[in-house]
């Protein structure tokens, strides 16, 4: 069952970030953040430092996208 993870860190340029993603495991959440931050800001994995990964309840989540994904109980493909 997917959970919402809040990943906190900073980049080599000094930019701090807090991203909420849905994932099965903390490792998957970190991989997704590396992909998102790296593609948005043209950074490699070495330039992204992850400080904290925590499970967040849907009520505590700040990201509307993460809340909506947790509300979906099934996906139908036509």
From Swiss-Prot:
May I have one GO cellular component term? ribosome
* One Gene Ontology term from the biological process aspect of the record: translation
One example GO MF annotation: structural constituent of ribosome
Listed NCBIfam families: PRK00773.1-1 (NF001981)
State how it assembles.
Part of the 50S ribosomal subunit. Binds 23S rRNA.
Q: Which family does it belong to?
A: Belongs to the eukaryotic ribosomal protein eL20 family.
What is the protein name stated in its UniProt record?
Large ribosomal subunit protein eL20
* Gene transcribed to yield this protein: rpl18a
């Amino acid at each position: 069952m997917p959970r919402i993870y809040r990943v906190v860190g900073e980049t080599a340029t000094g930019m701090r970030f807090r991203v909420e993603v849905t994932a099965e495991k903390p490792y998957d959440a970190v991989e997704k953040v590396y992909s998102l931050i790296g593609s948005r800001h043209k950074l490699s994995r070495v330039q992204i430092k992850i400080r904290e990964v925590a499970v967040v309840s849907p009520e505590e989540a700040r990201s509307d996208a993460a809340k909506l994904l947790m509300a979906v109980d099934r996906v139908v493909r036509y």
